[in-house]
UniProtKB/Swiss-Prot annotation:
Family in the record: Belongs to the glutaminase family.
Protein name: Glutaminase 2
Subunit structure: Homotetramer.
Taxonomic classification: Bacteria, Pseudomonadati, Pseudomonadota, Gammaproteobacteria, Enterobacterales
Keyword tags: Hydrolase
One MF annotation (Gene Ontology) recorded for this entry: glutaminase activity
Species: Escherichia coli (strain K12)
Disulfide partners: none
Amino acid sequence: MAVAMDNAILENILRQVRPLIGQGKVADYIPALATVDGSRLGIAICTVDGQLFQAGDAQERFSIQSISKVLSLVVAMRHYSEEEIWQRVGKDPSGSPFNSLVQLEMEQGIPRNPFINAGALVVCDMLQGRLSAPRQRMLEVVRGLSGVSDISYDTVVARSEFEHSARNAAIAWLMKSFGNFHHDVTTVLQNYFHYCALKMSCVELARTFVFLANQGKAIHIDEPVVTPMQARQINALMATSGMYQNAGEFAWRVGLPAKSGVGGGIVAIVPHEMAIAVWSPELDDAGNSLAGIAVLEQLTKQLGRSVY
C-alpha cells in the first residue's frame, strides 16, 4: 500500500467529511427508513489477508438495501449458467433512475443490468425457481461470508417496503407481460424486500464482500464463493452500474467498483487488496450516500488507489 493503514487514518477522514452531514437527505419514501439518524457515519476495511480497520459507527447495523443486489446475483451465479442469467438481464448501465419503467418498456422487458430494481427482481424471480427457501438461503450465504451468525432481516423495513411497493409491482408485472417474469409477483416481491431489509454493519459488509477483492475467495471459507472470472465480472458490473445513474461521476471521483443502497451504505472493492464499507444515511439526488462518497474519495486519494 502507498500508505500504511490504521484506524487513525480512517478517523481523520471521517473528521474531514463530517461537515457534509446535513447537506443530504435520508430516504423518506420508505417510512421505516425515514426515522434513521442522519448524523451516523462509519467506515470499515477488510483486507484480503483478514486485517480489519474501522472508525466511527462501523459496528452499527443498518438496512443495506440495494447492496443486497450483488449478493442475490452471487447466489444466482451458483445456481444458473451464464447463458441462463444473461439472456434475461443485461450488463449495461441504464442512465435512468433505478426504478424506471420507461426504459424497461422500450427494451421489451429486459432490464439493463442486475443492479437496478427491474434487474434485481428478475434475479429474485430466478432464485424462486431454483431454491426451496430463497430467504433462508440468503441468510445462510451472508452469515457464512461474514462469519456472523445473527445477521437477519429487519421485518419492519421489509413490511414498510411491501406496503409501498406499487412501482416495483408495476415493474414486475410489466416484465411478466413480456414473458421475463415467471413466478408469483407477490412472493418474489416479498423475497426482494427482505433481501433489501438485511441489517448489517460496515464491519460485517467489509468482511462479507472481501471475496470480490480476493478473486472470488472468502478469507475464512475453503470453498470459493464465485470463480475468479465471475468476481471480475461482478466488479465490472459494479463499476459501470453500481451507483445508479451517477456511476460515471463516482468513477471520476473515486475510481473503484462499488454498490450503494438507499440505506446510506456503499461497498467498494480494491481488487487484490481490500473491501471497503461506508455508511452515512443522508443521500444525494441520485440516492447515493453523500458523505459516504466523500469518505471514499478521500480514502482513495490518500491510498493512491484506482482501477483506472
